[in-house]
Amino acid sequence: MSATKLTRREQRARAQHFIDTLEGTAFPNSKRIYITGTHPGVRVPMREIQLSPTLIGGSKEQPQYEENEAIPVYDTSGPYGDPQIAINVQQGLAKLRQPWIDARADTEELTVRSSDYTRTRLADDGLDELRFSGLLTPKRAKTGRRVTQLHYARQGIITPEMEFIAIRENMGRERIRSEVLRHQHPGMSFGAHLPENITAEFVRDEVAAGRAIIPANINHPESEPMIIGRNFLVKVNANIGNSAVTSSIEEEVEKLVWSTRWGADTVMDLSTGRYIHETREWILRNSPVPIGTVPIYQALEKVNGIAEDLTWEAFRDTLLEQAEQGVDYFTIHAGVLLRYVPMTAKRLTGIVSRGGSIMAKWCLSHHQENFLYQHFREICEICAAYDVSLSLGDGLRPGSIQDANDEAQFAELHTLGELTKIAWEYDVQVMIEGPGHVPMQMIRRNMTEELEHCHEAPFYTLGPLTTDIAPGYDHFTSGIGAAMIGWFGCAMLCYVTPKEHLGLPNKEDVKQGLITYKIAAHAADLAKGHPGAQIRDNAMSKARFEFRWEDQFNLALDPFTARAYHDETLPQESGKVAHFCSMCGPKFCSMKISQEVRDYAAAQTIEVGMADMSENFRARGGEIYLHKEEA
């Protein structure tokens, strides 16, 4: 934790400096590689961790080494992870997907923005200094056309996005030759289908079945295609966003870049303060990962924070505004029905979802059904025109373990299943949001209920937190639940930071949350038996046993912290080659002793073999040459 708290001015200045000096940066001893596909422009980025050779013998003067293979890993950092790419936040990222979108010839450019609010903001000269300068001309589907990845998948079309994803999900594991590295324990997949090799056809089939989604708005061409589904790698979402009391555009862009560097597969912009529209534009134009939002937050800002004053018209305008900016998925709390609200009355913590509480208040105030539910088909029509995926929000999720798995939670979940089928009628991609706060023994039921009632649409959960007693450590309490539900089949985990329940996360909190959740997601992949998931673990274990300290640091999810902890007690360069660490010291290192035992056993085997040969030689009378009949 920082010893001195920065002032607001200092925080903004630091963020501005970060943006001004931003350049593509590789992790220690890593390099960016690209694997090309058959579609034009399909060039999939990965990070390859270079390893040092293993000493296998020889003398001090002439040591003998065995090379260790480089380890390819999934990389979410986009251009920010490539030192060869010049970064300019003022201009935004290259439009990777634009040629693919244009080649499909099913979209048209808009001469006028569809949102009244957008037109008002663009006409306000006072916002010129805040506004991103290189605004895109938005596109939408041509009349009568649908431009969603689900629509293409159902038509039997393998898009470049699907091929990109297939290559990416395989993580370059076909490059690994070592049997030691390729060894993997069988997993327990709970019904997930995990093919040894992921093909573009498999991606298409999963999307067509609704078991996976590709969040890819046609107005966010900068994004690198990724997939969310239980038959793929478990993904992690990071939340960022300003509020009425803290954070700025500069800081949110900094957190975006920081999030992608530390492994965020998607980012949700949950801004609720001033300049939501302008902040989101900067984020989208500089994001290599899909961006999600909760549109009701901004709609509420438009009616001065008074939930009762919300209208369908204001919400619809917000959807159009955000869809034309390029938001890839919307969280919509359409399952909070009027008749479900009384079910929360006996709860210990009531309704804890911001979106859920807003809609519950509106329903009770007007004594009418949720207008998001009433207008859900119109929402789907908008999403189908831009390929915005729907993340059906769990507005009645439990906010304490006492309220877990109650009547209100599952009533809403069943309604989300009904809405899923409606969205699929419009070829709109859907995932389902889940809890929340759930003790460990009650977690699996959440997954089985979701699969049954939501027709295997991808599940996306916030944790869940497994205990309520650890404010300041809720990244850990929730990481336990996240690993479990990821193993059971959850497709994406929404990170929780140490600041959960306490305040808005800063840059370091974002990193802590992401590292915790990358651990949870990876542990789930291992438990499911995802092909190739164990390669990095095996490489780390081999480096650890061989005291290759630099390789251990570089293989870590956070190389910098691993190195820093080691160097607190052994900072000298000699410590990087020592066959011990400060935990046990040179005489009690279990791995050093284990190596000595192994060497001793090998020597003993040789000695036993030589003794046997000697005994055999003496038994034959000491003759050097055998008689022909004996040979």
From Swiss-Prot:
Q: Which pathway does the record list? A: Cofactor biosynthesis; thiamine diphosphate biosynthesis
Binding, [4Fe-4S] cluster: 581, 584, 589
Task: Report the GO molecular function annotations.
Answer: 4 iron, 4 sulfur cluster binding; carbon-carbon lyase activity; zinc ion binding
| Top enzyme category | lyase
Q: What residues does Zn(2+) bind to?
A: 437, 501
Q: How is the cofactor bound?
A: Binds 1 [4Fe-4S] cluster per subunit. The cluster is coordinated with 3 cysteines and an exchangeable S-adenosyl-L-methionine.
The alphabetized UniProt keywords are: 4Fe-4S, Iron, Iron-sulfur, Lyase, Metal-binding, S-adenosyl-L-methionine, Thiamine biosynthesis, Zinc
- Catalytic reaction equation(s): 5-amino-1-(5-phospho-beta-D-ribosyl)imidazole + S-adenosyl-L-methionine = 4-amino-2-methyl-5-(phosphooxymethyl)pyrimidine + CO + 5'-deoxyadenosine + formate + L-methionine + 3 H(+)
E.C. number(s) listed in UniProt: 4.1.99.17
What Gene3D superfamilies does the database record attribute to this sequence?
A: 6.10.250.620, Radical SAM ThiC family, central domain (3.20.20.540)
Q: Which InterPro entries would you find in this protein's record?
A: ThiC, ThiC-associated_dom, ThiC/Bza_core_dom, ThiC/BzaA/B
Where do the annotations place substrate binding? Answer: 239, 268, 297, 333, 353-355, 394-397, 433, 460
The biological processes this protein is annotated with in GO are:
thiamine biosynthetic process; thiamine diphosphate biosynthetic process
Q: Which domain of life is it from?
A: Bacteria
Cofactor annotation:
[4Fe-4S] cluster
Q: Name one GO cellular component term.
A: cytosol
How the protein assembles, per its UniProt entry? Homodimer.
Q: Into which family does the record put it?
A: Belongs to the ThiC family.
Function noted in UniProt: Catalyzes the synthesis of the hydroxymethylpyrimidine phosphate (HMP-P) moiety of thiamine from aminoimidazole ribotide (AIR) in a radical S-adenosyl-L-methionine (SAM)-dependent reaction.
Please identify the protein, giving its name as recorded. Answer: Phosphomethylpyrimidine synthase
Q: Which organism is it from?
A: Shigella flexneri
